[in-house]
């Protein structure tokens, strides 16, 4: 049915176009004959218009009616480039009229939809705007400052933590060199004679209730070595020197020490020998054996190896 309808529309359109062309050709031929009969002076605008109206009202001439409809001013102003033949078909007229109605009514509806949509969007933006603005104020303020401060402090702490282990590994292991002065017989050293000999050799009673040999003989400056009691409790504390007695005293120095370790050892050994001579005692090693040249060489070798390991 659709194909048959399309064929009929095409055939009708062709027939109307042929009829229109024939009418135009006939009208043009008749117009030339009429203008040829009249003089030029009688041709004006006032006479031409009544003749067109007379041609329009003549019911016998179909071609004049078609010609009048084509030259209608309202039709030419609206669609000057459209084909006049197609408009004469009723099927095509229905199609065009339906499209025109849809265009006329659809455009206002589209505009109304846009207006309503814009109004709703504007209302939703105004309602949501305060909540959206407040959120960044709560989030951005702590994030812009605190991470930088945390990074700065964390970097400094990391440097301190790295420096501390390095300083600890540089420190050498503490070593102690010990000499002893022991009484020769069963008679112990009496405090009066013992303390007098110690003071004459530059030892000063001080911290931890023992005697110390300082850099200065007056008892000031760094401690080079110290002297303690061989017997329990190890201190040389006394209220009355005459009532104090012990079987021996211990000399000790630490490695590392202030100054030169070998010179401090020689000074400690010399002091121990003088006190032993004053009291009639013997100089012993750290195991409380009599001091021998080999053991003294062992002490000095220990000092040299320590200095080489920590040079």
Swiss-Prot record:
Positions on the Cytoplasmic side per record topology: 27-311
Keyword Transport: no
Keywords: Cell cycle, Cell division, Cell inner membrane, Cell membrane, Membrane, Transmembrane, Transmembrane helix
GO cellular component, one term: cell division site
Residue segments, region Disordered: 32-60
Primary localisation category: membrane
Biased amino acid composition, Basic and acidic residues: 32-54
Subunit relationships: Interacts with FtsZ via their C-terminal domains.
Protein purpose: Essential cell division protein that stabilizes the FtsZ protofilaments by cross-linking them and that serves as a cytoplasmic membrane anchor for the Z ring. Also required for the recruitment to the septal ring of downstream cell division proteins.
Protein name: Cell division protein ZipA
Organism in which the protein naturally occurs: Vibrio vulnificus (strain YJ016)
